[in-house]
């Protein structure tokens, strides 16, 4: 449906809603809002709006809905699939929530915090710590990503094994619908069996059904015991076996199990100028963390004994248990720095895929075979959250082929990897979402019934299709 009024007139009305200091219409100042942090997705917009409160968001959406103006919600713009970047039509308005950044309430007794959507994740974490609690969502981009974006993409991260995805950390939600109406469900209740759990519609829907403006999130006791180790392993099957044994031995104390292959370690050594972790090179590495808020747990001894047992079982070749905070920080820095290092070393295609944990070795091995067949001599890097079945897979352009040749191969590489993933009952998007990058995969790998249900929900909540279309 076409825009019903003079476009410039509508833009002026939108500016009036937020006030003169809360919008950008100068093209020269818009660039940070029109491309993603990896510089892979680019768009255009006539106006960047920065509302100060929910009422402003409501008025913006009501006006846009009435006049069929497309809206792209944006948080920290740290996504990896282009979901917060407008298209190149120059007709989509960006609604950036960065100024809605207040911590509204913290209740240590109830273990909850109420926040606005524009709060930076690291600030939420730090505020929780001041109240002697933690908010466990942890991402490499936590210094710039915003809680609203985390929830609308159902972010994962390094603590999913113990605490779950973002949507499992939410009790209540406020969201503005496409027509400007406000759904206020900011309940701080762990038990509330009064009809449909409507907040789930907005968690993971990437701003396509409305804009999350506030949330009640869960807090947890600060772990009083924490121990971290880097473990070297010769084969993938032993990596999975190690995870199984550690979970059996530690119960609920294992809080992270991150994976990096040898290629990842090599590129970190090369790019960061650091020493190798062990005297000998190994094919696979696991970053393991145990944590507990129970004061009488001796996690150091538990982890050391568990690893020693797996050395005897030939599932572990070597290990270092961190003896101080400096070592802990170094180990985690390796894993968290890796994506940023990889994005700077050449042209690549990347995957965010998941399968049942027991099938991870089959996925990784078969994916490497396919990549080598399609694109010989390519550099492949595999890392991720093996503890929850999520792998990140980077394949780089070989030196002997041109960028154009590599770009022509990308589609075949993607479809081959996604086909393998689908055959293993996996997902082509484990934690990064759909965005712009994976629209075609959504149509191809999702059943007709599921697609039709999504369309029914979208049509019901956003009949004019203005929300992040």
Residues covered by each model-derived region:
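Short, ordered loop/turn segments at secondary-structure junctions
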Residues: 28, 75-77, 140, 262, ...
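C-terminal substrate-recognition/cap domain of FAD-linked oxidoreductases
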Residues: 24-31, 230-233, 238-412, 416, ...
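N-terminal flexible segment immediately upstream of the FAD-binding catalytic core
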Residues: 1-62, 79-111, 264-275, 325-352, ...
